[in-house]
Amino acid sequence: MPLTPDIPRRTLLLASLSPLIGTDLARGQSRTLSADWAQTISKARGQTVYFNAWAGDEQTNAFIAWAGDMLKAEHGVQVNHVRLKDTAEAVTRVIAEKAAGRHSGGTVDLVWINGPNFLAMKQQGLLFGPVLPLLPNHRLVDTQTKRSNLIDFTTPVEGYAVPWKLAQIVFVYDSARISNPAEVPRSANELLAWARKHPGRLTHPNPANFLGATFLKQMLYELVPDIGVMQQPATDASFTAVSGPLWAWYEQLRPLLWRGGRQFPENGSAQRQLLNDGEIDITLSFNPADAAVSAAGGQLPASVRTFTLRKGTIGNTSFVAIPYNAAHAEGAMVLANFLLSPQAQARAQDIRHMGSVNVLDLARLPAADRALFDRLTPSPALPSAADLGQPQLEPHASWMTRLAAEWQRRTLR
């Protein structure tokens, strides 16, 4: 995923590099945008697109390889997956190229991006666009109920990135151990009450990891009367006032956690293993299909099920974006448009492949294309669209940074 576990390092890295370049988007635009899609297709033929994407998930890597095969066969476009450990690698490469005056022929054609990395590129004039309105499949994007397709961590996307897939917080439990669905906790207070009845059977990843920090964000959303305040940057005063109820709640929860709240799994994979080993009963994931995919792959028992909170859960969109100096922008546009196609979106949503939530408004699709989604691999662990509900928007990124730092200060003192 583009948002990597090391929150402080990425934030400091991008902040330290931002003085190197200007903030005027117009200065970053070096080529004329063409609304003639046939011309774009023609120019793309024979190009090699260097798609810079996080490579930490083999299912995603396989999907990118499949998309490359499809583009080669249909449009004569070669896709090379530049495998990243951290999206900031690609961002800093574009920053360095701009600082060196390399305003064309750049080494990054397309990058999987969101969050602080997208904000940095958008603010610093590193993006080609607005590109989304030029793609034929942009008309299929859901901009009503999937608001994160338009707003990325409070930053308006404004067509400078193309939605690819959705993520949303879900909770996973083993129905063999929690057999009564009425006992499943669906709020922060119910989660605390459940933990009191079942001490040691709940945990969350370390908030130095993105998923652990998101657990804190989600619980804060549960406990504040107006989550809108978190759409603004956190200040010392607002953070202290707004986060107070969270820490009061967490001080009660922590002793009831796995290993007395003295140790935490490093990431989602480690937390999932604890569920599989029977050490805990509930986990969380940013992939609604995680339980279904893991059960199908033997990493979780077949009895796992998925639930969300009564007031909803946080969701965000992964995007692809084209740097301002991309050597093969036309090929990158063709790839981005293909990723929006019903064919690609349905394959990505199938738990045999990625299990990601689509970014489309299915009501806009012709019947034949809608049928692709009706034929997806079923699973009792897979939540329905109604189960997920409308995702809550991510708060401003400053809240995540402060929550992770404050948790560390309180926990390690």
Task: Annotate the PLM regions.
Residues 33, 273, 380-413:
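Conserved C-terminal helix/tail region of periplasmic/extracytoplasmic solute-binding proteins
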Residues 118-120, 282-301:
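A ligand-binding cleft/hinge motif common to bilobed small-molecule-binding domains
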Residues 31-119:
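Early extracytoplasmic/lumenal segment of secretory-pathway proteins
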Residues 54-66, 81-89, 108, 112-269:
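Extracytoplasmic ligand-binding site segments that recognize negatively charged/polar headgroups
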Residues 97-110, 126, 198-201, 277-282:
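Alpha-to-beta junction loops
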Residues 313, 318, 322-387:
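Mature extracytoplasmic/periplasmic domains
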Residues 2-17:
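N-terminal secretory signal peptides and thylakoid transit peptides that target proteins
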Residues 250-253, 264, 300-321:
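Periplasmic-binding protein-like
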